[in-house]
């Protein structure tokens, strides 16, 4: 399975940006650029185009997509597209979904509820992470595609706070 364009747009909204010039958020060790690209390869003064930001995001998302597919295949969850997109967003932001699935022992409804627990940075609840986790949970629980009467299910998101790290509120 792969992330949908809706899933990519979801991640872009929550990551903020695109930051076309490298910047540091709070007390983070490394700089960020684009849509949440973070690491030692991002240097002070570095600049990219919007197209390069999109390319970086797609490359970065690939690791999260692979991780979610591995969990899906290993534990036979049979995630639908919205569940997959939601979990890919979570994995992109946190790095893993292992803590949600508990090695395949949790049901999908428990996984959705556990998402809400990951709203802290440095032990402090952050409104931006709380809102992102609520949106990921809502996407996870929403029907994928068309309903029985042909209606299309969509989700609106409110981006309250983005890019918050330790020391920022």
Q: What feature does the model see in each segment?
A:
Residues 32-34, 86-91, 113-114:
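Structural recognition of the beta-strand scaffold that forms the well-ordered cores
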């Amino acid at each position: 399975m792969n992330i949908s364009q809706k899933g990519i747009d979801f991640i872009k909204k929550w990551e903020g940006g695109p930051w076309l010039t490298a910047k540091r958020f709070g007390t983070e060790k490394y700089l960020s650029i684009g849509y949440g690209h973070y690491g030692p390869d991002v240097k002070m003064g570095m600049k990219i185009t919007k197209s390069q930001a999109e390319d970086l995001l797609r490359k970065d998302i690939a690791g999260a997509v692979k991780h979610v597919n591995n969990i899906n295949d290993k534990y036979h969850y049979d995630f639908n597209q919205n569940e997959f997109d939601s979990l890919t967003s979570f994995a992109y932001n946190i790095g893993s979904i292992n803590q949600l699935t508990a090695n395949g022992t949790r049901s999908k409804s428990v996984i959705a509820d556990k998402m809400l627990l990951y709203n802290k940075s440095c032990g402090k609840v952050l409104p931006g992470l709380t809102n992102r986790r609520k949106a990921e949970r809502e996407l996870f629980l929403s029907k994928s595609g068309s309903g029985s009467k042909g209606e299309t299910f969509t989700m609106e998101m409110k981006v309250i706070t983005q890019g918050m790290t330790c020391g920022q509120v």
